[in-house]
Amino acid sequence: MFDILVYLFENYYTPQACPAADVLAKRLAAAGFEHEDIDDALGWLYGLAETTERCVDLAQAPSSGIRIYTDSEYQQLGTESIGFIAFLESAGVLPAPLREIVIDRALAAPETPVSLAKTKIIALMVLWSQEAEIDNLVLEELLDDDGARRLH
């Protein structure tokens, strides 16, 4: 599923550039993706659209509150992902309403806990869905697969 999300980001400049779900499913199948993964990705994207629609008016509202995670959220997200979400928020990349969308979509992911690499893809897709301008350094970090980093 996550490979499909990255494929969509790389091939469609905005969500509006994506074709209708049935056409998109055919294109993804032609690109070699499995039908089960396509269904999962389309379902996940549908959930993203629903969540975004509910939160769109809140996206511009300033927030100075601190997010407290429930035990189940903490187990599903894991320490690394929660830390990364906090990093994006403190860097001004992820306003509080978009943070909530990232958390919602991470909780909808099939793995527990959600790996840091998958959390980065989720954050990328949430920002993409909002057509947010993403700084190049942030984009690099979001697309980094967390492989071994070379120290200089």
From Swiss-Prot:
Coiled coil ranges: none
Q: Which InterPro entries match?
A: Smg
PANTHER family, per database record? PROTEIN SMG
The family annotation for this protein states:
Belongs to the Smg family.
Q: What is this protein called?
A: Protein Smg homolog
Source organism of the structure: Bordetella petrii (strain ATCC BAA-461 / DSM 12804 / CCUG 43448)
